[in-house]
C-alpha cells in the first residue's frame, strides 16, 4: 500500500454500471454479441468507473463490481454446492435469483483474481480495494437444502472464501473487504457468525476490512473487537450517526469506516454537510483511525448522482483535513 492522507476516502464496492454496459449485457444474452465483445465492454466499464473515482478524488477505489450482477448470486454460481431453481420475488416487482445449497460446499477455482488483476493494471493507485461477500451473508441469503444446520454451512463457506482471499493476496491484493450485511440481522447467530468471518480471513496477509450496513447494530456491537480485521465500515448517515454512541459504549478499537453518504436517497449531500458530519464523528474517534465512505454500495443510483455524491464526500473531507492541519495534524 502507498501512503494515504489523513481521513482516507473510499467507496464500499458497487458503482452504477454505464448504460452502454447494460446494453451490451442485453445484447449478449440475446446472442447478438460475442463473449469477447462482452468482456471488452466489462473492461471498458472498469476503466470508466476508475476514471470517475479518480476525478472525484477517491483515495481507495474499487472496480465498481461491474462484472457482478448481485453480491450473493455471483459467488453461488462459482462455488460448488449451489443450484438455482428460478427467481424469487423480494418485494413488489423486484426478483432475486436466490440460490439453494444442494450438496457440500467446495471451492473450485479463483473467482475474483482475473477481475482484480485487470483492475490493478488500469488503476490510478495501488491502493485498490477488492470486495468479496462473506460466508454468513451468502448462507443467510440462500436456501439450505443439504446441511443439518446453518452453522455448518457457514463454516464450509468460510473455508472456500478463505482460499479465494489467499489467491487474491497472491495476485497482489493489498486491501480486501469482506461484505457481511446480514451478520447483524439474527442475534442468536452473531457470536458464531463472527467466528466464521475470522475463519474466512485466517492466515491472510493483507489489510482486511469488513462492511456491515443495514440491520441491528446492537446485536453485533459486543463482538466487533473480536473480528480479526483491521477496519469495519458502517452505514451511519441513514441512522443520523446514532450508532456512534453504541460503538463508544462497547469500546470499539479498530479503524472506523464512517458512512457519510446516503446511497438510497437521490439528494446530493453538500460538501459542508459532509464536513459537519465528519466533525461529529471526530467527537467520538480520533482522525488517525477514521476513513470516510458512503453508507453502502452506490449501484442503485444513477451514475451522475453517484459521482456527484462522491465529489461532495471528498470535498467535505478536504475541508476537515484543512481544519485538522491548522490544529497541527499531519494530513498528507
Curated annotation (Swiss-Prot):
InterPro entries: Met_Synth_C/arc, MetE_arc, UROD/MetE-like_sf. Zn(2+) binds at residues 211, 213, 296. Pathway: Amino-acid biosynthesis; L-methionine biosynthesis via de novo pathway. Keywords: Amino-acid biosynthesis, Metal-binding, Methionine biosynthesis, Methyltransferase, Transferase, Zinc. SUPFAM superfamilies: UROD/MetE-like. NCBIfam families: PRK04326.1. Belongs to the archaeal MetE family. This is Methionine synthase. It comes from Saccharolobus islandicus (strain L.S.2.15 / Lassen #1).
Amino acid at each position: 500500500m502507498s501512503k494515504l492522507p489523513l481521513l482516507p476516502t473510499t467507496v464500499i464496492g458497487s458503482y452504477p454500471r454505464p448504460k452502454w454496459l447494460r446494453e451490451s449485457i442485453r445484447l449478449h444474452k440475446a446472442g447478438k454479441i460475442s463473449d469477447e465483445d462482452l468482456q471488452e465492454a466489462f473492461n471498458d466499464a472498469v476503466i470508466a468507473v476508475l476514471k470517475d473515482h479518480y476525478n472525484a478524488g477517491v483515495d481507495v477505489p474499487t472496480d465498481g463490481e461491474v462484472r457482478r450482477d448481485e453480491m450473493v448470486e455471483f459467488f453461488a454460481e462459482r462455488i460448488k454446492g449451489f443450484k438455482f431453481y428460478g427467481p424469487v420475488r423480494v418485494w413488489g416487482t423486484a426478483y432475486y435469483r436466490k440460490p439453494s445449497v444442494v450438496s457440500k460446499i467446495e471451492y473450485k477455482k479463483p473467482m475474483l483474481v482475473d477481475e482484480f488483476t485487470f483492475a490493478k493494471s488500469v488503476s490510478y493507485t495501488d491502493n485498490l480495494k477488492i470486495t468479496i461477500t462473506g460466508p454468513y451473508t451468502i448462507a443467510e441469503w440462500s436456501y439450505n437444502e443439504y446441511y443439518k444446520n446453518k452453522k455448518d454451512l457457514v463454516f464450509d463457506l468460510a473455508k472456500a472464501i478463505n482460499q479465494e482471499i489467499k489467491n487474491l493476496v497472491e495476485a497482489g491484493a493489498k486491501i480486501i473487504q469482506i461484505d457481511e450485511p446480514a451478520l447483524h440481522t439474527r442475534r442468536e447467530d452473531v457470536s458464531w457468525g463472527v467466528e466464521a468471518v475470522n475463519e474466512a480471513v485466517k492466515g491472510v496477509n493483507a489489510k482486511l476490512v469488513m462492511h456491515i450496513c443495514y440491520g441491528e447494530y446492537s446485536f453485533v456491537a459486543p463482538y466487533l473487537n473480536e473480528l480479526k480485521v483491521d477496519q469495519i465500515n458502517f452505514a451511519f448517515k441513514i441512522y443520523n450517526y446514532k450508532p456512534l454512541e453504541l460503538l463508544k459504549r462497547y469500546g470499539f478499537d479498530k479503524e472506523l469506516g464512517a458512512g457519510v453518504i446516503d446511497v438510497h436517497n437521490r439528494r446530493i449531500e453538500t460538501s459542508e454537510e459532509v464536513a459537519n458530519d465528519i466533525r461529529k464523528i471526530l467527537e467520538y474517534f480520533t482522525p488517525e483511525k477514521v476513513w470516510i465512505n458512503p453508507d453502502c454500495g452506490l449501484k442503485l443510483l444513477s451514475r451522475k448522482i453517484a459521482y456527484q455524491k462522491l465529489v461532495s464526500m471528498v470535498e467535505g473531507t478536504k475541508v476537515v483535513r484543512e481544519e485538522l492541519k491548522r490544529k497541527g495534524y499531519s494530513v498528507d
